[in-house]
Amino acid sequence: MQLYALGLNHHTAPLTIREQVAFQPERLDDALHDLTHERTVREAAILSTCNRTELYFATEQPQHAADWLARFHHMPLSEVSPYLYTYPQRDAIRHVFRVASGLDSMVLGEPQILGQVKDAVRRAEEAGTMGTLLHKLFQNTFAVAKEVRSTTAIGANIVSMAAAALHLSERIFERMSDQRVLFIGAGEMIELCAAYFAGACPKRIAVANRTEARAQLVAHRFGAEVMRLDVVGEMLPHFDVVVSCTASPLPIVGLGMVERAIKARRHRPIVMVDLAVPRDIEAEVGELDDVFLYTVDDLAQIVDAGLESRQQAVLEAEEIIDSRVNGFLHWMQARDAVPTIRALRQHAETVRAVELERATRLLAKGEDPRKVLDALSHGLINKLMHSPTRYLNQSEGEQQADASRLVQQLFNLSNSPD
């Protein structure tokens, strides 16, 4: 039985595809049971986030997993297969270690993914689809992720626009839990920013977008409210932080709109983060006394500094992961040898029992104990050495040379002629 990882993520698939193969939480149990009812899949766990859908499973026939994924989501395999990756055992182990450690995330080193992996494991345990291999794999996965985060600086520096946006907001407002945040737009950048801000538990989150359906998707994920784009000016005074990133060719937030908002707020400060190119917020807004306006260029300076510090941490993390992959593979190989070890010990025990019974009978008849013990030891040697000796005698040519080396290694023998 081999371990595999199959899936797609933000590196390989656009959002339109990722949405179609995502697993809704209420359907996850059914999916796990359905997958493991495939005759070839023995164990399984499913990780499904906004950025990735991955199956971790034990099988001898991994090709059936892709068929199952497409079938479960009522998609032609040809539609999803160009975006899929399938990792065999060593690569699968390394992949899940990297995912949980944040090395494969859209935001390098982000901590949320570890919690998402733990949730995926918990759901698989509750569904009864975890077995010995996956239990051990994820036990090691969590240990590796903890080691990476505790011994490297992988999560210590800001390396994304989203993280930088939160960082700059926290410079102005000491407690984000007391602030109200408005997101204008509902694309991937806004979704990523929302993930960071939601982690700081603001008092209120709202999403304004031209397309209400898309805004609903983002709002549902983060417990936010949906707002029409045409009421942003009216509602602006009620928000302390505004993050905007749309594809609009013209500014959405103008100077007059912000001036009225500041007046209504009685000059309480407001942080505005404009991630759009071209800008969503008129540049003149930044000249207002109570407005802290940051653009893409401002955030890029923070990100660049973080990236430089992060490179060494990535190298250190990869070294840890490679070492732990080898350790896990060693455990798997040792586990594969367990049945043979048991059979070998059982064979030796059978020989011992037979010879001991014979010796006991001889002693009961009054035979010389020394002779009985001598016969016992010779009997054990002859029977235990019979199979290896016959194997050597029956081997020929290169096979005999290999057999000789194997026996010498097994019994720690020297190769001297005498």
From Swiss-Prot:
Enzyme class, broadest EC rank: oxidoreductase
Site (Important for activity): 95
GO biological process, one term: protoporphyrinogen IX biosynthetic process from glutamate
Annotated active site: 50
EC number: 1.2.1.70
MF terms (GO), sorted A to Z: glutamyl-tRNA reductase activity; NADP binding
Any matching Pfam family: GlutR_N
Keywords recorded for this protein, A-Z: NADP, Oxidoreductase, Porphyrin biosynthesis
Binding site for NADP(+): 185-190
InterPro entries for the chain: 4pyrrol_synth_GluRdtase, 4pyrrol_synth_GluRdtase_dimer, 4pyrrol_synth_GluRdtase_N, GluRdtase_CS, GluRdtase_dimer_dom_sf, GluRdtase_N_sf, NAD(P)-bd_dom_sf, Shikm_DH/Glu-tRNA_Rdtase
SUPFAM superfamilies to which the protein is assigned, alphabetical: Glutamyl tRNA-reductase catalytic, N-terminal domain (SSF69742), Glutamyl tRNA-reductase dimerization domain (SSF69075), NAD(P)-binding Rossmann-fold domains (SSF51735)
Coiled coil: none
Further remarks about this protein from its record: During catalysis, the active site Cys acts as a nucleophile attacking the alpha-carbonyl group of tRNA-bound glutamate with the formation of a thioester intermediate between enzyme and glutamate, and the concomitant release of tRNA(Glu). The thioester intermediate is finally reduced by direct hydride transfer from NADPH, to form the product GSA.
Family stated for the protein in its record: Belongs to the glutamyl-tRNA reductase family.
Domain notes: Possesses an unusual extended V-shaped dimeric structure with each monomer consisting of three distinct domains arranged along a curved 'spinal' alpha-helix. The N-terminal catalytic domain specifically recognizes the glutamate moiety of the substrate. The second domain is the NADPH-binding domain, and the third C-terminal domain is responsible for dimerization.
Subunit details: Homodimer.
Annotated function: Catalyzes the NADPH-dependent reduction of glutamyl-tRNA(Glu) to glutamate 1-semialdehyde (GSA).
Protein name: Glutamyl-tRNA reductase
Organism: Aromatoleum aromaticum (strain DSM 19018 / LMG 30748 / EbN1) (Azoarcus sp. (strain EbN1))
